[in-house]
């Protein structure tokens, strides 16, 4: 909220956040399979984690320092809400009532949880080990190529989501590209249901004699690539939308509470991330395994259904919940323009000596504002 309230700038956060994700999560995903080969037990070995964990810690520290540097200049009371330095502190007892009356924030928390759950489960290492290793029988030859293809497909979608957000609002962008992911994953689901009927119904990129790609693989790359690109580009989109919900609360009540909103959203985000590992563990137990499978474990009967549920069905249900929640989300592109204009007018009036209560009563919609705020 303090960095910018420009509807054309806020969506850019997803691009910068993705660069950070690629440096962090992307680096870990890239190095993990390479390091796992050097340790007996692969991903389950203590040596693997002793080597990989410091890499993640160093990357996290560097990215955190960049975040602190980025917000340092704007993290001042004069940029806080309508009242600036005069903004009153909110009591803890008021938080529940504020969230209860902020319907857009409630819906966004559902949407954010859905997007995060889909990404966390579908990209879980155990799920990918079962898919590319246990089912397809070639983890080393499929995981990295598919990961790279997924990132390649995501690039145009990041540009599209930002452009759509700038022109139509973040709600329209989120719903449009989550819908794309949902439709594409219907194709992925069908392909996984057909798996195992013959050698033609399995993923194959490279064989003993070179390139050995088949129609099944081409279709999988198309559906998975487009679907992954769409949902990876929208996975972090709810984060800048929290700022919209905070601005709405300032518009609605005059209170400035981005901290509590960000904390609540982050809490849901972390709970969902933790839940994803639990869901994977419970699902794996249904096929009789006592430990999480690695890329070297053989296929166990019923494992394909576990993969179908974790890799396709749960993400699809999560996306459906996101679309349902966002359907009633009131902060469209046009509404946010009005909110920003009204807040700006009130802020200037309070800075010039008007009481906050008077400013809140005097300006409540775009047509009530002076001409300079309506442009």
At which residue positions do the language-model features occur?
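A membrane-interface helix-boundary motif in multi-pass transporters
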Residues: 15, 34-58, 171-173, 210, ...
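Loop-to-transmembrane helix entry
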Residues: 12-15, 50-51, 132-152, 215, ...
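Helix-to-loop junctions at the C-terminal end of transmembrane segments
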Residues: 155-172
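C-terminal ends and interior cores of transmembrane alpha-helices
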Residues: 180-214
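Hydrophobic core of transmembrane alpha-helices in multi-pass small-molecule transporters
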Residues: 202-237, 241
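Loop-to-transmembrane helix entry/capping segments in MFS-fold secondary transporters
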Residues: 7-16, 139-141, 243, 249-266
